[in-house]
C-alpha cells in the first residue's frame, strides 16, 4: 500500500484524480493532501457487514495481558474451543479474539457461507464466556488479507499476543465433534432442499436498488444451501455477452433476451440464475421469460420512484441525461414500461435491501423450493 500522495504523484500532475471502481462508478477524489468520498460508500448486506463484527483495529482496545486469537476458516469444533479454554487458563489470558476470515467471493457449494461462519463464532463466543468468566471474548469479521499480509498478521494487528489457526478442512465425520451452533451451520450448508433450477429477473430504473437486492438474494440463497447460485449483473453482462450493443430499443431488447437465455441455461443445469438489468421494455422482458419456458421464473419489479433513484445516482448519469449529454437514458429520454406481469413489486425506498431479498426468497421458495 502507498500513501495517497505517492499514488497521486504516480498518476500525474492533475490537481485532483477521480478514483472509480471496475464498473467506472466514482468513489473518491484524490489530491496530494486528502481523499474525499464522492458519495457515502455502499456496503453489503448480511452479518459480514455488521458494524459490531466488522470492526477496525483501532476500535478494539488493547489489554495489558495475554490475548489469544483463533483464526476461524470454518465453524469451530469442540476440540478447538476446549484448546482455547485450556490455553487461556495456562497463560491467564484476558481476551480471546474469534477472527472469522471473510472472503469477497462465496464459499463453494455445500460449505458454510460467511454469514453462517459468523453465526457460529458468535455462538461460540457465548459458550466460551461461560467457561472463562474473567476473559473478554470478542467475535470479529476479518476480511481476507491482501498482498503479503497473512491472517496471523491481521490477528496481531487486533492485539493478539498468541495466534491459533483453526482447521481449514472438515474431518470425515463432521459434524460429529462440533458444538450445536457449528453443527447447525454445517447442516444448513449441506441442505439440498433447493433442488430445482430457477431464474429471477429483476427490472427497474438505474439506481433503484435492484443490483443490491439481487446480491442480497444470492447471499441468502447460498446461506441456505442453494447450489449453483449465479448473479448476472446487468452492467457486467453488457460488457461481455452484449458487448457492442447500443441503447436503442432494439439493442436493449436483444441485451435482455441474451441475458435471459444465459440465465435459462444456468437454471436448466440446476442453478439459480439471478439477473438485474434495467430491462425497460415489455418486449425484452417477454423474450427473457420465453427463454425460461418450463422453468420456475420470477419477474421482480423494483419500483423505487425516479426522484429517489436520482438522489442515489453515484455515477452522475441522471445529471448527464438531463443535461442532454447522454441520450436514450431510461426514465429521462427513454421510457420505462412498467411491467403489468411482475410476480413481485418492491419499492426499495420503503424497505431495506435485506427485507426485499427475503420477500423474493420466500416467493422463490414457493415457486421452486
Residue ranges and their predicted role:
Residues 205:
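P-loop (Walker A) phosphate-binding loop of NTP-binding proteins
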Residues 1-197:
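Nucleotidyltransferase catalytic core that binds NTPs
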Amino acid at each position: 500500500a502507498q500513501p495517497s500522495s505517492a499514488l497521486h504523484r504516480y498518476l500525474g500532475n492533475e490537481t485532483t484524480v477521480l478514483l472509480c471502481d471496475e464498473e467506472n462508478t466514482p468513489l473518491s477524489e484524490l489530491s496530494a493532501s486528502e481523499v474525499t468520498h464522492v458519495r457515502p460508500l455502499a456496503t453489503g448486506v448480511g452479518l459480514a457487514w455488521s458494524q459490531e463484527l466488522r470492526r477496525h483495529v483501532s476500535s478494539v482496545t488493547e489489554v495489558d495481558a495475554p490475548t489469544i486469537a483463533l483464526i476461524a476458516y470454518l465453524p469451530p469444533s469442540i476440540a478447538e474451543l476446549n484448546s482455547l479454554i485450556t490455553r487461556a487458563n495456562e497463560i491467564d489470558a484476558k481476551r480471546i479474539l474469534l477472527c472469522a476470515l471473510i472472503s469477497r467471493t462465496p464459499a463453494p457449494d455445500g460449505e458454510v457461507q460467511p454469514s453462517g461462519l459468523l453465526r457460529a463464532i458468535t455462538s461460540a463466543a457465548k459458550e466460551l464466556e461461560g467457561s472463562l468468566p474473567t476473559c473478554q471474548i470478542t467475535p470479529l469479521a476479518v476480511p481476507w488479507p491482501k498482498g503479503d499480509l497473512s491472517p496471523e498478521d491481521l490477528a496481531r494487528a487486533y492485539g493478539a499476543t498468541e495466534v491459533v489457526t483453526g482447521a481449514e478442512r472438515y474431518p470425515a465425520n463432521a459434524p460429529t465433534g462440533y458444538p450445536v451452533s457449528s453443527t447447525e451451520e454445517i447442516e444448513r450448508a449441506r441442505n439440498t432442499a433447493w433442488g430445482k433450477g430457477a431464474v429471477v429477473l429483476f427490472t427497474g430504473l438505474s439506481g433503484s436498488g435492484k443490483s443490491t437486492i439481487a446480491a442480497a438474494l444470492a447471499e441468502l440463497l447460498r446461506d441456505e444451501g442453494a447450489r449453483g447460485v449465479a448473479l448476472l449483473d446487468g452492467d457486467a453482462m453488457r460488457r461481455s455477452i452484449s458487448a457492442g450493443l447500443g441503447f436503442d430499443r432494439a439493442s436493449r431488447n436483444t441485451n435482455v433476451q441474451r441475458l435471459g437465455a444465459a440465465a435459462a441455461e444456468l437454471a436448466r443445469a440446476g442453478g439459480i440464475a439471478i439477473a438485474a438489468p434495467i430491462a425497460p421494455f415489455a418486449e425484452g422482458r417477454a423474450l427473457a421469460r420465453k427463454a425460461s419456458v418450463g422453468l420456475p421464473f420470477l419477474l421482480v419489479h423494483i419500483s423505487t420512484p425516479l426522484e429517489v433513484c436520482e438522489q442515489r445516482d453515484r455515477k452522475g448519469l441522471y445529471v448527464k441525461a438531463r443535461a442532454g449529454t447522454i441520450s436514450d437514458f431510461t426514465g429521462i429520454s427513454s421510457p420505462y414500461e412498467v411491467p403489468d406481469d411482475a410476480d413481485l413489486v418492491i419499492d426499495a425506498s420503503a424497505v431495506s435491501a435485506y427485507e426485499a431479498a427475503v420477500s423474493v426468497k420466500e416467493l422463490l421458495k414457493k415457486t421452486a423450493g
